[in-house]
């Protein structure tokens, strides 16, 4: 299994670059950057990271086809791929928080993602393109350079139709936050529909899962509040899908939690999110995160590998008193040796 990490853009730019260098030295496969509204710009930071690293993979997870025109994304990502040949990938998904961009209304992600990827790939071939899609429109344009490298294109989701789209046209699929076999098998069932539609096989794609990770000192240690908060936001962002799945994911769903899922307001207010965290069953929490002692984390990652997950992209949640860098070092020393493919040392070069 390949083990990668991700930044949400919260740390300073200097600290981000230091984290990328640290992750490379520790043997992580990739350091991805979230494309969140409105944190620090991922394109600027990933471009800088190409100069402060030499081996580690880089890229975006997750971007969307609406916030930036896909032609501009094609231009920027091909430029980045030239800076770090073979190391850059894009993970595209449905996006979120469009309420801050009133001109984006009624997005249909399956259609938008398909159209965006089609246009980007055509532009990367050097073609002059006119594209008249439902969401993506482009008139008689082409890149004014011949890309010397192009990024790999993955699709991320936990919704059935987008997972199927990933199987159909993606070079990889990033499963959104499922960390146990039932969730992975659910996702694989929908990915298989896309593979079948396109007459592809599992050998044609890479299967990844996004997981929230915290290492505890003791099995009975209380789960830190920060990872509860992060995981609950992931759950709530796919409320409809998760409501339909809760009984497949866990056997400890309470009537009170089920009632909350059906009756709570469709909002992100502090009160609603606090109730969600309070009511969330431990089994549901474990289905979307990896929390435990080093031995427990190793066992959980091995169980994911056993059902076909080839890469985990971790969002690291340090415990109180611990920094992200501390957790990366702890993961590298206590987890990676037991589960991860090790990088080839000849891939390194000295970077100032």
Model-derived regions: residue spans:
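Acidic (Asp/Glu)-rich catalytic clusters
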Residues: 24, 46-57, 77-88, 167, ...
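N-terminal beta1-alpha1-beta2 module of alpha/beta enzyme domains
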Residues: 1-61, 151, 346-352
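Conserved, mostly hydrophobic/aromatic
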Residues: 27, 49, 80, 120, ...
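Active-site mouth loops of central-metabolism enzymes
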Residues: 2-14, 63-70, 147-158, 213-216, ...
């Amino acid at each position: 299994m390949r083990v990668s990490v991700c930044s949400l853009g919260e740390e300073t730019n200097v600290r981000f670059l230091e984290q990328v260098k640290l992750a490379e030295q520790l043997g992580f496969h990739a350091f991805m950057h979230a494309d969140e509204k409105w944190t620090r710009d991922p394109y600027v930071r990933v471009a800088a990271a190409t100069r402060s690293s030499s081996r580690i993979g880089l890229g975006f997870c997750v971007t969307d086809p609406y916030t930036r025109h896909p032609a501009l994304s094609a231009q920027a990502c091909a430029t980045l791929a030239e800076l770090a040949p073979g190391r850059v990938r894009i993970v595209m998904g449905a996006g979120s928080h469009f309420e801050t961009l009133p001109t984006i209304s009624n997005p249909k992600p399956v259609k938008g993602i398909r159209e965006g990827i089609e246009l980007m790939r055509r532009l990367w071939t050097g073609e002059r393109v006119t594209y008249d899609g439902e969401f993506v429109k482009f008139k008689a344009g082409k890149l004014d350079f011949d890309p010397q490298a192009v990024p790999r294109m993955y699709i991320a989701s936990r919704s059935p139709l987008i997972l199927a789209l990933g199987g159909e046209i993606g070079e990889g699929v990033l499963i959104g936050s499922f960390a146990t076999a039932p969730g992975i098998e659910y996702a694989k069932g929908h990915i298989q529909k896309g593979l079948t539609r396109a007459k592809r096989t599992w050998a044609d794609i890479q299967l990844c899962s996004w997981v929230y990770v915290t290492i505890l000192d003791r099995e009975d240690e209380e789960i830190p509040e920060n990872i509860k908060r992060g995981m609950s936001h992931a759950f709530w962002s796919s409320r409809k899908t998760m409501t339909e799945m809760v009984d497949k994911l866990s056997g400890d769903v309470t009537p009170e939690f089920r009632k909350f899922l059906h009756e709570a307001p469709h909002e992100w207010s502090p009160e609603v999110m606090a109730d969600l965290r309070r009511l969330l069953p431990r089994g549901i929490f474990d289905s979307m995160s990896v929390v435990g002692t080093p031995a427990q984390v190793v066992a959980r990652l091995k169980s994911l590998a056993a059902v076909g997950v080839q890469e985990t992209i971790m969002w690291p949640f340090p415990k109180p008193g611990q920094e992200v860098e501390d957790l990366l070092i702890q993961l590298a020393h206590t987890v990676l040796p037991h589960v991860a493919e090790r990088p080839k040392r000849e891939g390194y070069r000295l970077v100032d």
